[in-house]
């Protein structure tokens, strides 16, 4: 894996609050190597470790993107939904930002069928086919289309399983991580002080509750993906 410089600096991470963990009573002992101190009843994350693993994650996604690999970003926390969508669109990644349905990856054949139905419905609406149907049927189809857009809109162009999955909240997206582990899909996950760093291939110790922290980490990863995509396009 190529090692590159990703302009990750401690001052920027401190300003974003990346170092703030959970209260000392809400911690996972496996996170001990990533904690540098306790302050006013709160664990403080060791940002040198954050920088190291974030850099490794950026190297991984850059190399994968430069080979034309596909990515899925998962973040269903309400406050992060818009951030997840905009970051994924910017980096041409698939994303899930509303709800993770159990079996979304492990029951891929079912997910693929739903995506096919979604694409067909969108095409029919665009071609004006709904205009020739009774109003009641149109209302039913539009409700179905709206639901599919809400929950599957971020993966509507996904035709196969992703090569790498990025998870923004380990505890909230635990099922997604388990599905990736079952399928052998490499994962990158933010891990706060109450998380298990062993659940992902690359765990980035960071505050996963504050938007500024999530945004900083995600932006670094997205920048690396975009750089990798650019290299792939130049070489092909």
Curated annotation (Swiss-Prot):
Single GO biological process annotation from the record: translation
GO cellular component, one term: mitochondrial small ribosomal subunit
Compartments reported by the entry: Plastid, Chloroplast
SUPFAM superfamilies in UniProt: Ribosomal protein S2
PROSITE patterns tied to this protein: RIBOSOMAL_S2_1 (PS00962), RIBOSOMAL_S2_2 (PS00963)
Pfam families tied to this protein: Ribosomal_S2 (PF00318)
Highest rank taxon of the organism: Eukaryota
Single Gene Ontology MF annotation: structural constituent of ribosome
Keywords: Chloroplast, Plastid, Ribonucleoprotein, Ribosomal protein
Main subcellular localisation: plastid
HAMAP family linked to this entry: Ribosomal_uS2_B
PANTHER family: 30S RIBOSOMAL PROTEIN S2 PROKARYOTIC AND ORGANELLAR, SMALL RIBOSOMAL SUBUNIT PROTEIN US2M
Entry's family note: Belongs to the universal ribosomal protein uS2 family.
Protein name (Swiss-Prot/TrEMBL): Small ribosomal subunit protein uS2c
Organism: Lolium perenne (Perennial ryegrass)
Origin organism lineage: Eukaryota, Viridiplantae, Streptophyta, Embryophyta, Tracheophyta
Protein encoded by which gene: rps2
């Amino acid at each position: 894996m190529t090692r590159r410089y990703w302009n990750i600096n401690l001052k920027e991470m401190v300003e974003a609050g990346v170092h703030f963990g959970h209260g000392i009573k809400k911690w996972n002992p496996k996170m001990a190597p990533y904690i540098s101190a306790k302050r006013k009843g709160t664990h403080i994350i060791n940002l040198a470790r954050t920088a190291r693993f974030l850099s490794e994650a950026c190297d991984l996604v850059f190399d994968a993107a430069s080979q034309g690999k596909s990515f899925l970003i998962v973040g269903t926390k309400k406050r992060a939904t818009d951030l997840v969508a905009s970051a994924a669109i910017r980096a041409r990644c698939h994303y899930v930002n509303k709800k993770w349905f159990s079996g979304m990856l492990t029951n891929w054949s079912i997910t693929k069928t739903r995506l096919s139905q979604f694409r067909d419905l969108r095409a029919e609406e665009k071609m004006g086919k709904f205009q020739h149907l009774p109003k009641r049927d149109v209302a039913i189809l539009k409700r179905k289309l709206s639901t599919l857009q809400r929950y599957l809109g971020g993966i509507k162009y996904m035709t196969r399983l992703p090569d790498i999955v990025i998870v923004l909240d380990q505890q909230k997206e635990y099922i997604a991580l388990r599905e990736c582990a079952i399928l052998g899909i490499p994962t990158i996950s933010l891990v706060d002080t109450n998380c298990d760093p062993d659940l992902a291939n690359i765990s980035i110790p960071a505050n996963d509750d504050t938007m500024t922290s999530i945004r900083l980490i995600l932006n670094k990863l997205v920048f690396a993906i975009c750089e990798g995509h650019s290299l792939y396009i130049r070489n092909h």
